[in-house]
């Protein structure tokens, strides 16, 4: 099976998701999730950060954790193709891999 790119990269598609997509806010985690159905056969993910999120090492670690948790939970989205954008907006988050994985598992079931 060919490895698919699960990253969302097109600027036009990202703007469309921000405008037309559904929004879920998590005030206790300072996290927002936008999602919208796509016409592809697979789901895609984008993790972005607000301007207040400092430190490239921490940003890249959080991004890697989200992508890995999403990749492992991709089978829950079988038959549904959605584009998901996570906006992380606070620097002092205590995000562990297991917390992110349980968050994504619950969110995927809501989508």
UniProtKB/Swiss-Prot annotation:
Protein name, UniProt field: Ribonuclease P protein component
Subunit structure: Consists of a catalytic RNA component (M1 or rnpB) and a protein subunit.
Species of the source: Borrelia garinii subsp. bavariensis (strain ATCC BAA-2496 / DSM 23469 / PBi)
Classification via HAMAP family: RNase_P
Pfam families from the UniProt entry: Ribonuclease_P
Keywords linked to the UniProt accession: Endonuclease, Hydrolase, Nuclease, RNA-binding, tRNA processing
Catalysed reactions listed for this entry: Endonucleolytic cleavage of RNA, removing 5'-extranucleotides from tRNA precursor
GO biological process terms, semicolon-separated: tRNA 5'-leader removal
Similarity comment text for this entry: Belongs to the RnpA family.
Molecular function terms from GO: ribonuclease P activity; tRNA binding
Gene3D superfamilies: 3.30.230.10
E.C. designation(s): 3.1.26.5
Source superkingdom: Bacteria
Role of this protein: RNaseP catalyzes the removal of the 5'-leader sequence from pre-tRNA to produce the mature 5'-terminus. It can also cleave other RNA substrates such as 4.5S RNA. The protein component plays an auxiliary but essential role in vivo by binding to the 5'-leader sequence and broadening the substrate specificity of the ribozyme.
